[in-house]
Amino acid sequence: MSGPGIEGLAVGLNKGHAATQLPVKQRQNRHKGVASKKTKIVRELVREITGFAPYERRVLEMLRISKDKRALKFLKRRIGTHRRAKGKREELQNVIIAQRKAHK
């Protein structure tokens, strides 16, 4: 009775009417915090025009000379939370990587 191909059993863990499950759509509230295409473009444009804040330039210098931990501590003092500081550090590291790729 416990064969893998049997469906619609009367007893056991797999008992009940055999039915195919519909794919469940992701709920709309799960999109909180995800930037839209338009938002990404606008932020990219603003970054291109305004450049970096003074504290961000200082962090970029720290990251260039491999002072990652010092940069994180500095960012945490400026931004306020550890999690946001980690995100900002990651963002600025990606900027440095992009600059190196563009330079080659």
UniProtKB/Swiss-Prot annotation:
Tell me the InterPro entries matching this sequence.
Ribosomal_eL36, Ribosomal_eL36_sf
Q: Which keywords label this protein?
A: Acetylation, Cytoplasm, Ribonucleoprotein, Ribosomal protein
UniProt key word Ribonucleoprotein: yes
The protein's GO terms of the molecular function aspect are:
structural constituent of ribosome
Which Pfam families does this one have? Ribosomal_L36e
Primary site of residence:
cytoplasm
Q: An example of a Gene Ontology BP annotation on this entry? A: cytoplasmic translation
Q: So where does this one cross the membrane?
A: none
Any one GO CC term of the record: cytosolic large ribosomal subunit
Q: Which residues carry this modification: N-acetylserine?
A: 2
Where it sits in the cell: the answer is:
Cytoplasm, Cytosol; Cytoplasm
* Tagged with keyword Cytoplasm: yes
Question: Family, per the entry?
Answer: Belongs to the eukaryotic ribosomal protein eL36 family.
Q: What does this protein do?
A: Component of the large ribosomal subunit.
Assembly with partners or alone: Component of the large ribosomal subunit.
Q: What is this protein called?
A: Large ribosomal subunit protein eL36
Top-level taxonomy: Eukaryota, Metazoa, Ecdysozoa, Nematoda, Chromadorea
Q: Which gene encodes it?
A: rpl-36
